[in-house]
Design a protein with these regions (language model features):
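N-terminal phosphate-binding or glycine-rich loops at protein starts, especially the Walker A/P-loop
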Residues: 1-52
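Short glycine-rich or small-residue beta-strand-to-loop segments that form or flank ligand, phosphate
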Residues: 4-14, 73-79, 105-111, 137, ...
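Gly-rich Lys/Arg/Thr-decorated short loops/hinges at beta-loop-alpha junctions or inter-strand turns
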Residues: 4-7, 67-81, 140-150, 178-180, ...
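Short, ordered loop/turn segments at secondary-structure junctions
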Residues: 10-12, 39-45, 79-80, 112-113, ...
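Short glycine/serine/threonine-rich phosphate/pyrophosphate-binding segments
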Residues: 14-24, 46-47, 90-93, 113-121, ...
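Glycine-rich oxoanion-binding loops at beta->alpha junctions
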Residues: 49-105, 114, 153-155, 167
């Protein structure tokens, strides 16, 4: 049997998404894989037989290094949800027919919660029909909401970007004597890991954000305005960090208080946008002071110019661990990161049953949020800080970062 493997990327991109792909590719090559295929646009592309030989696209060690430092998704991504096996067996038969045609022995999928659901379903189907293909999930998400792992690759670099931008916005807000309130809207539907990273801006040379609101705690609009009013009476410039997904006590998204959104993605998730603007407009209307909303949006997930070396290193490692696990005969597993020491920071890789991960969501512990729900504690800051350490700058050509791309992508 040939030792051919295939890898795909799925879900929202990160600044280190491709570092995990590089880890899969290089380790598979070093372990003697015959052909390393890449799925274009994830499982959706596989169904359409959009497949490339990565050996023809990643030609040498310099290409591997470029891949590690290229943000977003080299192979392209998708948000495609596989049906339950009982609902559409034909789609699984089609996937496995394609994999068998390519003589695949191992299948790697780099992604988030929904991607781990794909690994779960494919490994379950393989077991049902007695197919020996091994399925391993490689964690990735800036949201940091995957169960079973200390943190996810992609989060550290996003946290570094958010902390840096917050610090710079605090500095920018102090340039005029005029009173101002800046509301920074940060990604995070149900989990506030990203927004919590704004606390890292609080340092010797920066007072950091004045208020931080996470979706784990119900948001009270009146209480918010009361606190902002008090801050306005005390300070020249106020900076507030809010998760896009904060909700009121009755379960309504704050961004929908002005106009409910009817837009959803392929997984049925409401598309959130406008939380910062709604609150900023409310401050102007109710308090009569200058305010602006800053929506970090996709910038926080594609900032390859400000990555964490720790994050890139770990992203590469989980890719390599996935390959080693498959070559050892493991299947139905997700690679995880285990923090074995806080100071000095030491993290190792391990495996975790994908059935305990798929479709679950890890939230910020309530004890890491202040009692009033308007800031995060030292425990959260200590948890995040090691993940943003050191830098791995892009390879620069004529003053611009050089990226590796697939010509026909």
């Amino acid at each position: 049997m040939k030792k051919n493997v295939i890898v795909g990327q799925s879900g929202g991109p990160t600044a280190v998404f491709n570092a995990s792909l590089a880890g899969v590719y290089k380790t598979a090559k070093d372990m003697g894989a015959d052909t390393i295929y890449g799925m274009r646009y994830g499982i959706q592309g596989l169904l359409e037989k959009k497949i490339v030989d990565l050996g023809e696209k990643i030609r040498n060690d310099m290409d591997v290094e470029l891949l590690k430092r290229t943000p977003a998704s080299f192979l392209g991504s998708c948000r495609y949800k596989l049906p339950e096996i009982s609902e559409d067996k034909a789609i699984y038969e089609k996937i496995f027919a394609i994999l068998e045609e390519l003589e695949i022995m191992a299948f790697f999928y780099i992604g988030d919660n929904d991607s781990m659901d794909t690994i779960k379903k494919l490994s379950d189907y393989a077991e049902t029909v007695g197919n020996p293909i091994r399925f391993i999930g490689v964690p990735k998400t800036i949201d940091n909401d995957l169960e079973g792992t200390d943190h996810t690759p992609g989060y550290g670099s996003a946290a570094k970007y958010i902390a840096t931008v917050t610090k710079e916005l605090v500095r920018d807000g102090l340039i005029y004597e005029m009173q101002s309130v800046t509301v920074i809207e940060i990604m995070g539907r149900n989990a506030g890991w990203l927004t919590g990273a704004a606390v890292l801006a609080k340092s010797e040379d920066c007072e950091g954000p004045d208020l931080i609101y996470l979706p784990e705690v119900a948001f009270d609009v009146d209480d918010f305005l009361k606190k902002v009013k008090k801050l306005v009476s005390e300070k020249q410039s106020i900076v507030i960090a809010v998760s896009e997904g904060i909700k009121t006590a009755d379960g309504r998204y704050v961004c929908e208080l002005s106009a409910p959104s009817d837009k959803t993605d392929s997984f049925g998730h409401v598309q959130l946008s406008g939380t910062g603007k709604y609150l900023s407009d409310l401050i102007i209307e109710k308090l009569g002071c200058k305010s602006r909303a800053i929506e970090l949006s996709t910038l926080q997930r594609c900032a390859g110019h400000l990555t964490s070396r720790v994050d890139i290193t770990e992203a590469y490692q989980v890719g390599g661990t996935a390959v080693k696990a498959a070559f050892e005969g493991k299947t139905g597993q997700m690679v995880i990161l285990k923090r074995v020491s806080q100071d000095p920071y030491i993290c190792t890789t391990d495996l975790y049953d994908v059935h305990k991960v798929a479709n679950l969501e890890k939230k910020v512990p309530r004890s890491w949020i202040t009692e009033e729900g308007d800031y995060v504690t030292a425990e959260m800051k200590n948890y995040i800080e090691p993940l943003i350490q050191a830098e791995l700058t892009p390879i620069m050509i004529t003053g611009q970062p050089r990226h590796i791309i697939i010509d026909d992508l």
